[in-house]
């Protein structure tokens, strides 16, 4: 059995109809038995669902979590093709449509099994613990900056209260980790790794990462944690006691980020698990 691990598909930046979605699948997603997507399938809910309707014909099983772009809704002059003005209603509709696809599993604080593997996940959320390495800012300042950040501007979710959102996502994550999964998927990144040097001094790092030491310490040996959100690749093996845990970032990203910047073949090799 083979599993391909990825994130940040942003399909609606590549495709507007089913024909273009099919091309995207063949162009950017290699063949495997299982596809794992750690968030940011699409802002557009129709394209989100159509993508999985088509991808489910290629893969034996698909596991997916939500990402920050999946939570966006129509407001003012933004996302006018999105019929939803409340994030909860959008997510409920997506869940309902995905439930019609027997080989697509949405992980939202839940786990599922395929063969002997247990896979679990949720979106996760940032905790403002990471920022600029050279010019650190207090949490209060970062919270204020978050008011102008993409998520707060385009979500209508849990009153856009970052403390409440974090608490809810960590509750989901605790449930996932308690099941001792072989693969964990979150969109937000569980520790500050994979930050490109050019971004090390960006305060916006605070909106990508969270401190997951408590959860990493409880993971089983040779497990994998797939994350996304950043559009840069990364791989790191952590030691948690006697256990080794692989952290993996393998996004698709936006069209201008894919052209000539990386080899699809190399990506497939780096993020393909063979059992």
Task: Label the predicted regions.
Residues 1-64, 70-76, 274:
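N-terminal active-site segment of His-dependent metallophosphoesterases
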Residues 1-4, 111-121, 181, 237-246:
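Beta-strand-turn-beta hairpins that frame and shape the catalytic cleft
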Residues 5-7, 35-40, 63-68, 105-109, ...:
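Active-site neighborhood of phospho(di)ester-bond hydrolases with catalytic His/Asp-centered motifs
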Residues 10-16, 42-47, 69-79, 111-114, ...:
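Active-site environment of divalent metal-dependent phosphoester hydrolases
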Residues 61-134:
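A basic- and aromatic-enriched beta-loop-alpha substructure that forms the phosphate/nucleotide-
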Residues 74-88, 197-204, 260-263:
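Short, flexible/disordered intra-domain loops and linkers
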Residues 113, 196, 205, 209-222, ...:
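Binuclear metal-dependent phosphoesterase catalytic core
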Residues 118-184, 188-202:
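Active-site-proximal loop/helix segment associated with metal-binding centers of metalloenzymes
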